């Protein structure tokens, strides 16, 4: 498969032959389209790990995400067909606004977590990184957001951690070095140590290769592309606009070696 560097536009290639791939780490808010192909991929010999984002944020932030109640049902099915260790729940990003304060996130986390207890062992959290594009999108919709203080972040994280512990779920922080410095466990989205335990038949890949400050990830290849997700989340940094993402998705050719054919 070929994929472009999002900045230099240089084209890179990577083999997707099962014998050449240690494992595939997926990120998604909606795995239902994948479920019919899961058994096929497993029989082909692919080792797979899943990050499943379920937040229940309002439509003005996540206009096209599935209802969180549906997402918990799909996560359960995915977990039953793999294992609770193979599926990680992501409750991120946390966006603090006038409406969405700490109390809202605590209630929402407890509601979602109570449905997922026994079906996942980990939950990754992070507070929204206010990139310029993210700020503009929020401001355009008139959303009054603010950057919480470290004390607020830590207090909320500890509240979520306490709820999660009662549900048998471990909370980890993704790219939040300020929280890690206060004792919150660092998340590793591409966790070579965990993947080696899940797939012991594969040669371990343990090289630490962070993608940004506070990242704990193992070396990997990101074969996704910007401006291809049409869910249109307001806080997203990977899309210029939902319209552009729709246009680009229409150009997708399953027979092409890239998600999108080159112009």
Residue ranges and their predicted role:
Residues 1-61, 73-82, 242-263:
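Conserved Radical SAM active-site core
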Residues 136-144, 184-190:
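Short, surface-exposed, charged loop/turn segments at secondary-structure junctions
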Residues 213-240:
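Local cysteine-cluster metal-coordination motifs and their immediate loop/turn environment
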């Amino acid at each position: 498969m070929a994929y472009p560097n999002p900045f230099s536009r240089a084209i890179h290639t990577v083999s997707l032959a099962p014998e050449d791939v240690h494992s595939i780490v997926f990120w998604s808010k909606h795995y239902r389209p994948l479920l019919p192909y899961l058994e096929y991929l497993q029989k082909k010999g692919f080792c797979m790990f899943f990050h499943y984002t379920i937040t229940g944020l309002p439509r003005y932030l996540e206009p096209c995400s599935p209802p969180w109640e549906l997402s918990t049902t799909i996560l359960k099915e995915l977990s039953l067909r793999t294992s609770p260790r193979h599926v990680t729940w992501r409750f991120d990003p946390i966006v603090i606004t006038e409406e969405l304060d700490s109390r809202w996130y605590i209630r929402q986390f407890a509601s979602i977590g109570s449905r997922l207890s026994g079906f996942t062992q980990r939950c990754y959290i992070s507070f929204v990184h206010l990139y310029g594009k993210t700020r503009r999108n929020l401001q355009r919709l008139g959303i009054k957001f603010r950057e919480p203080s470290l004390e607020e972040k830590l207090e909320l994280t500890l509240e979520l951690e306490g709820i999660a512990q009662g549900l048998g779920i471990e909370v980890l922080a993704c790219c939040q070095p300020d929280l890690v410095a206060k004792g919150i466990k660092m998340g590793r989205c591409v966790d070579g140590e965990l993947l080696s335990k899940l797939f012991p038949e594969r040669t371990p890949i343990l090289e630490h290769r962070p993608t940004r400050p506070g990242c704990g990830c193992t070396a990997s290849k990101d074969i996704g592309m910007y401006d291809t997700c049409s869910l249109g989340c307001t806080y997203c940094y990977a899309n210029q606009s939902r319209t552009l993402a729709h246009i680009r998705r229409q150009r997708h050719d399953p027979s092409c070696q890239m998600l999108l054919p080159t112009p």
